[in-house]
Amino acid sequence: MVGRNSAIAAGVCGALFIGYCIYFDRKRRSDPNFKNRLRERRKKQKLAKERAGLSKLPDLKDAEAVQKFFLEEIQLGEELLAQGDYEKGVDHLTNAIAVCGQPQQLLQVLQQTLPPPVFQMLLTKLPTISQRIVSAQSLAEDDVE
């Protein structure tokens, strides 16, 4: 008797679940803005991921890759600052400083060339970017081991 009641309850729950799936699918298919909203959501997620994530980090043991990354980040940072996009420009410059072999000298040069508010923004972001690079490097080393 108990087994029969359990089977009936499971069957009813399964039927309700399938009914809800059919209802949701029909509602989704009949909505003309569903695809547009889905595209917008994916676009926002992609932009958020680009903002939050670092540029693809080079292998820090490969001097040539680090130098190429450094030069690209400096160039991108300068271009973005020239366009007025200070936030992204500072992000790229902090990436360059984090992988730089002589960060103190680079900071002195940037202090002389950047406006004081932009340089302060750079100094504010530097610890977090450096920490991300160190953690990314340690994760890469863990993968090798």
Curated annotation (Swiss-Prot):
Signal peptide: none annotated. Residues 25-145 are cytoplasmic. There is a cross-link at residues 35, 56, 61, 68 (Glycyl lysine isopeptide (Lys-Gly) (interchain with G-Cter in ubiquitin)). It is a single-pass membrane protein. The chain crosses the membrane at residues 7-24. The keyword Calcium does not apply. It is found in: Mitochondrion outer membrane. Gene3D superfamilies: Mitochondrial outer membrane translocase complex, subunit Tom20 domain. InterPro entries: MAS20, MAS20_rcpt_metazoan, Tom20_dom_sf. SUPFAM superfamilies: Mitochondrial import receptor subunit Tom20. Keywords: Isopeptide bond, Membrane, Mitochondrion, Mitochondrion outer membrane, Phosphoprotein, Protein transport, Transmembrane, Transmembrane helix, Transport, Ubl conjugation. PANTHER family: MITOCHONDRIAL IMPORT RECEPTOR SUBUNIT TOM20, MITOCHONDRIAL IMPORT RECEPTOR SUBUNIT TOM20 HOMOLOG. Forms part of the preprotein translocase complex of the outer mitochondrial membrane (TOM complex) which consists of at least 7 different proteins (TOMM5, TOMM6, TOMM7, TOMM20, TOMM22, TOMM40 and TOMM70). Interacts with TOM22. Interacts with APEX1. Interacts with TBC1D21. Upon mitochondrial depolarization, interacts with PINK1; the interaction is required for PINK1-TOM-TIM23 supercomplex formation which is critical for PINK1 stabilization at the outer mitochondrial membrane, kinase activation and downstream mitophagy. Central component of the receptor complex responsible for the recognition and translocation of cytosolically synthesized mitochondrial preproteins. Together with TOM22 functions as the transit peptide receptor at the surface of the mitochondrion outer membrane and facilitates the movement of preproteins into the TOM40 translocation pore. Required for the translocation across the mitochondrial outer membrane of cytochrome P450 monooxygenases. Belongs to the Tom20 family. This is Mitochondrial import receptor subunit TOM20 homolog. It comes from Rattus norvegicus. The lineage of its organism: Eukaryota, Metazoa, Chordata, Craniata, Vertebrata.
